[in-house]
Amino acid sequence: MYFVYILVSEVDGTLYTGQTQDINARLKLHNSGKVQSTRKKSPWHLGYFEVFNRRSDAMWREREFKKKWNTERKKRLIAHFNRIKIEVLLKSENTFLPNPLRVYDS
């Protein structure tokens, strides 16, 4: 599975969008200071994510978020996203996905 995610900086609320296969490891990497583009605004927390079966679909969605969605639109999406889904996922170590969670498969 592939994840498209939006991180929120706890320093100033800046948003960062990316995609990965391991969302837990990627969040830890961002918070470790090893990712140049997020180093200065650490710590980060997971604000939103979507799940895809194919990497190409996740990459397409990531580009869509980056090119077609402005910051305010992303913030509205995060505000409406159910925080419980994120907490369950982070505790699960990717062994299952909470329901109902949309998995995109084309």
Language model segments and positions:
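Structure-specific nucleic-acid interaction/processing domains
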Residues: 1-17, 21-106
